[in-house]
Amino acid sequence: MLTFRSSILLQGPANTPELETLVVLVSIIANMTTLFAIAAFMERDPHTFDRLPGWLFCALIMAGLVVIDVAGRLGNDATMMALLVGGSVLTGVGYGYYWGSWAEYLGRMHPSRTSFYVPMAFLLTAALFLIISLSAEYESAPPLLLMLPLPVLSLVCLRRCHAEVPDGRYARTVDSKRYLTALASLVTLIVASLVLSLLFGLVWEMTVLSVGSVNEAHQAPLVANLVVAVCLIGLVLYAHKRLDLALAYRVIVPVIVILFAVLPFFWETSPVVLNAVMSACYGTFDVIIWYMVVSASYDFAVSGFVIGALVRGLSILARLLGIGIGYLLMLVP
């Protein structure tokens, strides 16, 4: 979620829907590239991840946030564009490492733990960014000062997870067959992810250009995500004693796919409301992806980073395509 919230740092001539979209696009491309690159090395040598300096990626994020914040204060368009792209790349690389790291550590934990941790993390993230957005808009708090502590806090949590002993068998040796088996178990989820990510990217970009601001387009969805997170946590607490959580998630996914296929036809009614509903649905699906990916990583004793990078990377590609289509559609009078 950090990837999409970096745009609140833009100010002055940089604070336009087009440049906000540019920051998001460059950042998630760098995010995806980092995920694929680290996963490629880890597939050959699982110990690669443990040798990566987490503090370096934290520093990249913080440096990128500062560069993006400074870019809008400059009058020179060429310099501003260079700083925006450079800052977005730095943050994207750091975010890619962070996302993969959480997939790696959660993949070492028993699914009974991750089924609660994942929606709880989603709840805390949505709450944090809603507070940051409202503070920046209504309290005139500097967005940069609100954003900078977050990568440090996340790194501290990652260090705490690194010190834990894995619950089950951990992937310390290379076994391509186990990776293929794990991915095969997620095929339907991956296909659904491609469809939903494309449609979400499409509606998100159309909403941003329609209301003229990424921040405005995100506030209602953040509230919707809070509601979704609370409902998912309630489902998890209920499911521990009453039903199979994985089965419940597999029932929820087709419902979300159908909603995503139908909702764009109601675009003219209210773009912001439609974006909020689709964001809530996508937030639900994002939690399901996290849970199923880390559960598969645990069950098949493979790296959560590698499996997560493949699933997440494909999702990002589909979202990029959706954003591109949405941008082109909004150019049509």
Predicted regions and their residues:
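C-terminal transmembrane helical hairpin of 12-TM major facilitator-type secondary transporters
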Residues: 243-286
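Intracellular loop-helix junctions on the cytosolic face of multi-pass helical membrane proteins
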Residues: 112-116, 126-213, 227-243
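Central cavity-lining transmembrane alpha-helices of secondary-active solute carriers
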Residues: 21-45, 226-235
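Glycine-rich segments within core transmembrane alpha-helices of 12-TM secondary carriers
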Residues: 29-32, 111-136, 306-326
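Helix-loop boundary and gating motifs at the non-cytosolic
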Residues: 1-33, 188-214, 290-291
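Hydrophobic core of transmembrane alpha-helices in multi-pass small-molecule transporters
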Residues: 77-98, 270-287
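C-terminal ends and interior cores of transmembrane alpha-helices
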Residues: 58-77, 252-268
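Intracellular juxtamembrane helix-capping segments at the cytosolic ends
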Residues: 95-109, 284-301
